[in-house]
From Swiss-Prot:
Task of the protein: Responsible for the low-affinity transport of potassium into the cell. Likely operates as a K(+):H(+) symporter.
Taxonomic path: Bacteria, Pseudomonadati, Pseudomonadota, Gammaproteobacteria, Enterobacterales
Domain of life: Bacteria
The protein's name: Low affinity potassium transport system protein Kup
Alphabetically ordered keywords of this record: Cell inner membrane, Cell membrane, Ion transport, Membrane, Potassium, Potassium transport, Symport, Transmembrane, Transmembrane helix, Transport
Reactions performed catalytically: K(+)(in) + H(+)(in) = K(+)(out) + H(+)(out)
Assigned GO CC terms: plasma membrane
Localization (cell): Cell inner membrane
PANTHER family per UniProt: LOW AFFINITY POTASSIUM TRANSPORT SYSTEM PROTEIN KUP, OSMOTIC STRESS POTASSIUM TRANSPORTER
Species per Swiss-Prot/TrEMBL record: Escherichia fergusonii (strain ATCC 35469 / DSM 13698 / CCUG 18766 / IAM 14443 / JCM 21226 / LMG 7866 / NBRC 102419 / NCTC 12128 / CDC 0568-73)
Topology term for the membrane: Multi-pass membrane protein
Keyword Hydrolase found: no
TM region(s), chain numbering: 9-29, 49-69, 103-123, 137-157, 165-185, 213-233, 247-267, 276-296, 337-357, 363-383, 396-416, 419-439
Pfam family, one: K_trans_C
């Protein structure tokens, strides 16, 4: 059942406003200020103001309304979206070589998100707290400490979940967007001339007049669409129609009115460039506006944090990151999770960024490379889906791709100018995450191939054991097996060293499907291999967390009775050593060993009682 059917359309649309549009909805705090603050050599003059407003408006129309909401959101995997989902869809009907290239693109896009996610909470919260400079200039030195305090509280409450406070997100963000619209409309009424900037010719005129500098200035304009990936990534939570409805009825009109309201203010009072957003408000409204802005930026940060939790779980389940502890914070909503390691690593990174950059304007210089890089990759992957999966005409798809790249590539190229002034930060973080994900995936594959190269037949071994059985002991033994037709290492070593076997043996494989969820009817497949051997294959989607107790329950319904506290679980524990390698592969091998040592152990990963687990060690050279 789709999300839209579970709740009323107004309720789910309101919820989408509260979660999906937090990042892009707080962009008016700093976007126009960064465009006209003087770093590009523009004065606060009519042509520049009109040019930037026209660029911002048409970027919102083309990138958000047309590209993402109309085209990209057509590509879903059982209703789910996101860059890794797009990667999976794009690789379904392509050659092995093309699939490898698409996987690399998807991983780069996911890595870019990790780079961006460190900046979003910092720049959002700091931009709101900087409103203190207008209310009380003497509190300027408190901006960094207050930003850290706000974000510390936010990261501390993650372990308790956001179900309770999450109910407040939607009304707060709706209030925020109404305030954006109201402040902007008030200023536009005082200077309606600014509406001329709706004409796209002002954007064209801007490029013709300012030439090279106007191209570099695109690096600031792109701040208006940061968070656009959230529209696609959160599609599974809210559905396509509510997200589209929220955009066209509330978010887009509010953003447009506020940006144009800031422009109208600057045309009348160029000195307002120091903080045009807060100076839109009358003096009596500054403190309430500061409070609601702080709340809105916290909500925007929460959406990003939840997004990185979801992406991490997906990467873990698809085998691109090592297993780690994932805590469900809601019994009702499977999407509400908490990952302690990711939470505190992200917190430390955000605090370091705030202390290092000190002001949101400095952070704006680091923002944009990851966003626009992901946009380029999304264009390529989504058009691949259109051609390979939807079988659209190749010439039509080529035209769409060219149109998208004509916008994406200039935006990305313009942001490369920020490389030395802060753009290195998201690129560096993204590079680290890309290396980690590709290392874990490739080295894990190498390890499994090494472990399975003995080539013994499972069926032949079972037949031999039934014909000449070893000593049988009462009870049930479960051997965890990564591959279906391969003899588990733990079974081989148990027979080799202990020379005994339980009366009933279950070979259990937990498999991740290329889908977010697996229906309970398809959850468990049971096959009796011999009078005393059973094979159980349990399938899970990448948004689900495997649970052995649930598997046993499903087995009981299928006629294979299993009791957790009467079963022994045999698992292999590999002690890894590096073989001879070139120096660069040796470095990758050492990184894998580090990741392996810190990975969540299988008993904890599958929630198996520790006193029911027997681990058999083996040394493997990789």
């Amino acid at each position: 059942m789709s999300t839209e059917n579970k709740q009323s359309l107004p309720a789910i649309t309101l919820a989408a406003i509260g979660v999906v549009y937090g990042d892009i909805g707080t962009s008016p705090l700093y976007t126009l200020r960064e465009c006209l603050s003087g770093q590009f050599g523009f004065g606060v003059e009519r042509d520049a103001v009109f040019g930037f407003l026209s660029l911002i408006f048409w970027l919102l129309i083309f990138v958000v309304s047309i590209k993402y909401l109309t085209f990209v959101m057509r590509a879903d995997n059982a209703g789910e979206g996101g860059i890794l989902t797009l990667m999976s869809l794009a690789g379904r009907n392509t050659s092995a070589r093309t699939t490898s290239m698409l996987v690399i693109m998807g991983l780069i896009g996911g890595s870019f998100f990790y780079g961006e996610v460190v900046i979003t909470p910092a720049i959002s919260v700091m931009s709101a707290i900087e409103g203190l400079e207008i209310v009380a200039p003497q509190l300027d030195t408190w901006i960094v400490p207050l930003s850290i305090i706000v974000l510390t509280l936010l990261f501390m409450i993650q372990k308790h979940g956001t179900a309770m406070v999450g109910k407040l997100f939607a009304p707060i963000m709706l209030t925020w967007f109404l305030i954006l619209a109201g402040l902007g409309l008030r200023s536009i009424i005082a200077n309606p001339e600014v509406l001329h900037a709706l004409n796209p010719m002002w954007a064209v005129h801007f490029f013709l007049e300012y030439k090279t500098v106007s191209f570099i200035a695109l690096g600031a304009v792109v701040l208006s669409i940061t968070g656009v990936e959230a529209l696609y990534a959160d599609m599974g939570h809210f559905g396509k129609f509510p997200i589209r409805l929220a955009w066209f009825t509330v978010v887009l009109p509010s953003l447009t009115l506020n940006y144009f309201g800031q422009g109208a203010l600057l045309l009348k009072n160029p000195e307002a460039i120091k903080n045009p957003f807060f100076l839109l408000a009358p003096d009596w409204a500054l403190i309430p506006l500061l409070i609601i802005a702080a709340l809105a930026t916290v909500i925007a940060s929460q959406a990003v944090i939840s997004g990185v939790f979801s992406l991490t779980r997906q990467a873990v389940r698809l085998g691109y990151l090592s297993p780690m502890r994932i805590i469900h914070t809601s019994e009702m909503e499977s999407g509400q999770i908490y990952i302690p390691f990711v939470n505190w690593m992200l917190y430390v990174a955000v605090v370091i960024v705030i202390v290092s950059f000190e002001h949101s304007s400095n952070l704006a210089a680091a923002y944009g490379i990851a966003v626009t890089g992901t946009m380029v990759l999304t264009s390529i992957l989504s058009t691949t889906v259109a051609r390979q999966n939807w079988h659209w005409n190749k010439y039509f798809v080529a035209l769409i791709l060219i149109a998208f790249l004509c916008v994406d590539i200039p935006l990305f190229t313009a942001n490369l100018d920020k490389l030395l002034s802060g753009g290195w930060l998201p690129l560096s973080l993204g590079t680290v995450m890309f290396i980690v994900m590709t290392t874990w995936k490739s080295e894990r594959f190498r390890l499994l191939r090494r472990m399975h190269e003995h080539g013994n037949s499972l069926e032949a071994m079972i037949a031999s054991l039934e014909k000449s059985p070893p000593v049988r002991v009462p009870g049930t033994a479960v051997y965890m097996s990564r591959a279906i037709n391969v003899i588990p290492f733990a079974l081989m070593h148990n027979l080799k060293h202990n020379k005994v076997l339980h009366e009933r043996v279950i070979l259990l494989t937990l498999r991740t499907e290329d889908a977010p969820y697996v229906h309970n009817v398809r959850r468990v497949q049971i096959e009796q291999l011999s009078p005393t051997f059973w094979r159980v294959v349990a399938s899970y989607g990448w948004r689900e967390t495997p649970n052995v107790e649930e598997v046993f329950h499903r087995c009981g319904l299928e006629g294979l009775s299993c009791r957790m506290m009467e079963t022994s679980f045999f698992m292999s524990h590999e002690s890894l050593i590096l073989g001879k390698r070139p120096w660069y592969l040796r470095l990758r091998g050492k990184l894998y060993l580090l990741l392996q040592r810190n990975a969540l152990r299988a008993p904890d990963q599958f929630e198996i009682p520790p006193n029911r687990v027997i681990e058999l060690g083996t040394q493997v050279e990789i």
